[in-house]
Curated annotation (Swiss-Prot):
This is Enzymatic polyprotein. One of its GO terms (molecular function) is RNA-directed DNA polymerase activity. GO terms for biological process: proteolysis. Transmembrane segments: none annotated. Its EC number is 3.4.23.-, 2.7.7.49. The active site is at 47.
Length: 674
C-alpha cells in the first residue's frame, strides 16, 4: 500500500493536461503480437527524455512479465523515486510494418500504454523528427518513415487483455482519449531524464558487464586471473619434518573425500605430493555445512603452524571500518571466490602444505585455509589493491564493502572497484554479490539506515546451544558468541562471570542443575538484539558509566537533532570485571576507573571530539579539577588525571535516582540471576 500511495503521490505531482496536437508530442502507431491473443494496437509515445522503454501491465500479458534481477529505481526532478520491479525481455514492436526488437521493457503505470525511450532511439539511430512524421533507421541501413498521430488514445485498462484473448467473448473496454485526460507524464524539466535515473539501463548494464568479467566459480579461472597474488611460507627450523599421523575414516567420509579431492585436482589447487611433511585432513559438518548440503574438508595444520614463521600483518580493526561508513546511505558488497586459493604459493612453500586423506598424499598450489599466515597474506594483497579507494571502500580479508552518500556516486564507486578487480584479476562470487542496498550484511552485522545489530544467525547460535553443557570447550564456544555480541548486551561481564568461573584451570569440570537453570535464564533474556545507532561525525556524544564492587559498565550515546528536538540514541555498551587489586579500591576510584575503561572502549569515537561524561558519582567532577602535588600515595590518581587530559569533555552529575542507566543495568542483571 505504501508503494501504491507513493506512486500516486508522484503521479499527482507530475501530471498535466497534454495537448496532443503540440508538434513536440510524438505519438506513433505500434503493434504487439502474443501467442493466444489478437493483435494489440497501441498509440506509443516517443519520449527521448526517458532513458527506458516503459509499458503498462495492461497491454502485455502477465506471463510475459518477470521479476527484475534487482529493483530499478528512477528519480525525478523533485527528488521522488519510482521503483520498477517487473520487466519484459526480448519483445518485438511492429511499426509501419517493420519489426523493431526491444531487449527490455520496464513495467510502470505512467498513464500511457507504451513509452518509447531514448535507448530505443539510440538503438535505431539516427532518429529524425519532422512536423508530420519521424524516421527510425532499421539495421543502420534503411530509413523507416512513420506518421505522427494527431489524436492518441489509451487502450490499456482493467479487462483489456482478457478481451484480446482469442475466442474471448469479453467486450473490449472503451479507449480513453489522452488529449482530454490527465496523464502522469513528466514534462520538460520533470521527465525521466538519463541524468536523474538512479540506475539507468545503460549504467546498470555497464555494472553487470564489469561484474561478469570478474566473477567465476573457479578461483583460478585462466580467463580471468592475473595470478598477481603470491606467497611464501618458511619453517623456523628447515631441517625438521612435520608429521602428524593419518586419521581413520568411515566409508561415507571416504566417498565424500573422493568427490572433493577430484574437484580440487580439477581446479588445480592441489597436486599429488612427495613431501616429507604431512597433516591429516578431515570433514566437518556444522550448521553452515548442513545449510549448503556439503561437508567441508579441513586440514589439521596445528603442528605446521607451530613450526612456521608467522606473519604479523593484521586485518583492520572492525570498529575502525565501521566508523568509515557512518552516515553512508547506499552499499554494495562483494565476496572473493575462495579468496585464499587466489594466492599462489611459491614452489618451495608447497611441500609444507602436504596433507593425507583416504586418496593419498597431496599438497597445495595455493594458500590453503587453516594456515595461520593465510589471513595476513590475503589482507596485505587486498590492501595493496584497494587502499587508494579508502574513502568509499573497505576490505576485511575477503569481504569488500563499497559505500556512498548517494546513488550517483555509488554507480561510479562500484564501477571503479570492479575495474580494479578486473585489472588485478581478483575473482568474485556472483552469488554473494549484493548491489545497491540500503540494508546490508557486513562483518557479521546487519547495517540498516544508520543502525546496526548482529545478524540473525548469532541469535540462532545462542538459542541452539544446549542448556546442559558437556565440557569446558563447549562452554568456551558459548561465551565466545556472547563476547562477539558484547556491544549489544548491557553488563555482559556480570552475566558471564558465573559461567566463566567454571573455566579456571584448577576447577574440575562439573555441570549442575543450577548451571542449567542459569543457562536457560541467560538465553531467555537474549531473545533479540536492539538495533544500535551509528553516530554521525557531527552528533554530540555522551558516555554514561556505572560501577559496583566487582564490575563496571558503560554506554555510548549520541544526541540526534531532528526538527529542533534532541533525542539521545544508544550506540554501544561496554562492561568488565575489576581485577583483584582493583576490587580493593575506594568506591570513588572504582567510579573513576569505570569512566576510564569506558573511554578506552569507545576511544575511536571519542578522539578528537568534545564529549560529555555523565555519572552519578559526585567525586568524579571534582577529581578532574583537583591539583595533586605528587604525593606518592596518590600516584594512581595523578596517572589517571594525566591520561584523561588527552581527551576533551564536560562532566555532568546526575542524581542516583535519575541514573536510569545504572537502574537498567541492575534490572537486566537481576532478571538473569533471579
Amino acid at each position: 500500500m505504501d508503494h501504491l500511495l507513493q506512486k500516486t503521490q508522484i503521479q499527482n505531482q507530475t501530471e498535466q493536461v497534454m495537448n496532443i496536437t503540440n508538434p513536440n508530442s510524438i505519438y506513433i502507431k505500434g503493434r504487439l503480437y502474443f501467442k493466444g491473443y489478437k493483435k494489440i494496437e497501441l498509440h506509443c509515445f516517443v519520449d527521448t527524455g526517458a532513458s527506458l522503454c516503459i509499458a503498462s501491465k495492461f497491454v502485455i500479458p502477465e506471463e510475459h512479465w518477470i521479476n527484475a534481477e534487482r529493483p530499478i529505481m528512477v528519480k525525478i526532478a523533485d527528488g521522488s523515486s519510482i521503483t520498477i520491479n517487473k520487466v519484459c525481455r526480448d519483445i518485438d514492436l511492429i511499426i509501419a510494418g517493420e519489426i523493431f526488437h526491444i531487449p527490455t521493457v520496464y513495467q510502470q503505470e505512467s498513464g500511457i500504454d507504451f513509452i518509447i525511450g531514448n535507448n530505443f532511439c539510440q538503438l535505431y539511430e539516427p532518429f529524425i523528427q519532422f512536423t508530420d512524421r519521424v524516421i527510425f533507421t532499421k539495421d543502420r541501413t534503411y530509413p523507416v518513415h512513420i506518421a505522427k498521430l494527431t489524436r492518441a488514445v489509451r487502450v490499456g485498462t482493467e479487462g483489456f487483455l482478457e478481451s484480446m484473448k482469442k475466442r474471448s467473448k469479453t467486450q473490449q473496454p472503451e479507449p480513453v482519449n489522452i488529449s482530454t485526460n490527465k496523464i502522469a507524464i513528466l514534462s520538460e524539466g520533470r521527465r525521466l531524464s538519463e541524468e536523474k535515473l538512479f540506475i539507468t539501463q545503460q549504467r546498470m548494464q555497464k555494472i553487470e558487464e564489469l561484474l561478469e568479467k570478474v566473477c567465476s566459480e573457479n578461483p583460478l579461472d585462466p580467463n580471468k586471473t592475473k595470478q598477481w597474488m603470491k606467497a611464501s611460507i618458511k619453517l623456523s627450523d628447515p631441517s625438521k619434518a612435520i608429521k602428524v599421523k593419518p586419521m581413520k575414516y568411515s566409508p561415507m567420509d571416504r566417498e565424500e573425500f573422493d568427490k572433493q579431492i577430484k574437484e580440487l585436482l580439477d581446479l588445480k589447487v592441489i597436486k599429488p605430493s612427495k613431501s616429507p611433511h604431512m597433516a591429516p585432513a578431515f570433514l566437518v559438518n556444522n550448521e553452515a555445512e548442513k545449510r549448503r548440503g556439503k561437508k567441508r574438508m579441513v586440514v589439521n595444520y596445528k603442528a605446521m603452524n607451530k613450526a612456521t614463521v608467522g606473519d604479523a600483518y593484521n586485518p583492520p580493526n572492525k570498529d575502525e571500518l565501521l566508523t568509515l561508513i557512518r552516515g553512508k546511505k547506499i552499499f554494495s558488497s562483494f565476496d572473493c571466490k575462495s579468496g585464499f586459493w587466489q594466492v599462489l604459493l611459491d614452489q618451495e612453500s608447497r611441500p609444507l602444505t602436504a596433507f593425507t586423506c583416504p586418496q593419498g598424499h597431496y599438497e597445495w598450489n595455493v594458500v590453503p585455509f587453516g594456515l595461520k599466515q593465510a589471513p595476513s597474506i590475503f589482507q596485505r594483497h587486498m590492501d595493496e589493491a584497494f587502499r587508494v579507494f579508502r574513502k568509499f571502500c573497505c576490505v576485511y580479508v575477503d569481504d569488500i564493502l563499497v559505500f556512498s552518500n548517494n546513488e550517483e556516486d555509488h554507480l561510479l564507486h562500484v564501477a571503479m572497484i570492479l575495474q580494479k578487480c578486473n585489472q588485478h584479476g581478483i575473482i568474485l562470487s556472483k552469488k554473494k554479490a549484493q548491489l545497491f542496498k540500503k540494508k546490508i550484511n557486513f562483518l557479521g552485522l546487519e547495517i540498516d539506515e544508520g543502525t546496526h545489530k548482529p545478524q540473525g544467525h548469532i541469535l540462532e547460535h545462542i538459542n541452539k546451544f544446549p542448556d546442559t553443557l558437556e565440557d569446558k570447550k563447549q562452554l568456551q564456544r558459548f561465551l565466545g558468541i556472547l563476547t562477539y555480541a558484547s556491544d549489544y548486551i548491557p553488563k555482559l561481564a556480570q552475566i558471564r562471570k558465573p559461567l566463566q568461573a567454571k573455566l579456571k584451570e584448577n576447577v574440575p569440570w562439573k555441570w549442575t542443575k543450577e548451571d542449567t537453570l542459569y543457562m536457560q535464564k541467560v538465553k531467555k533474556n537474549l531473545q533479540g538484539f536492539p538495533p544500535l545507532h551509528h553516530p554521525l561525525p557531527e552528533e554530540k556524544l555522551i558516555i554514561e558509566t556505572d560501577a559496583s564492587d566487582d564490575y563496571w559498565g558503560g554506554m555510548l550515546k549520541a544526541i540526534k537533532i531532528n526538527e529542533g528536538t534532541n533525542t539521545e540514541l544508544i550506540c554501544r555498551y561496554a562492561s568488565g570485571s575489576f581485577k583483584a587489586a582493583e576490587k580493593n579500591y575506594h568506591s570513588n576510584d572504582k567510579e573513576t576507573l569505570a569512566v576510564i575503561n569506558t573511554i578506552k572502549k569507545f576511544s575511536i569515537y571519542l578522539t578528537p571530539v568534545h564529549f560529555l561524561i555523565r555519572t552519578d558519582n559526585t567525586h568524579f567532577k571534582s577529581f578532574v579539577n583537583l591539583n595533586y602535588k605528587g604525593d606518592s600515595k596518590l600516584g594512581r590518581n595523578i596517572r589517571w588525571q594525566a591520561w584523561l587530559s588527552h581527551y576533551s569533555f564536560d562532566v555532568e552529575h546526575i542524581k542516583g535516582t535519575d541514573n536510569h542507566f545504572a537502574d537498567f543495568l541492575s534490572r537486566e542483571f537481576n532478571r538473569v540471576n533471579s
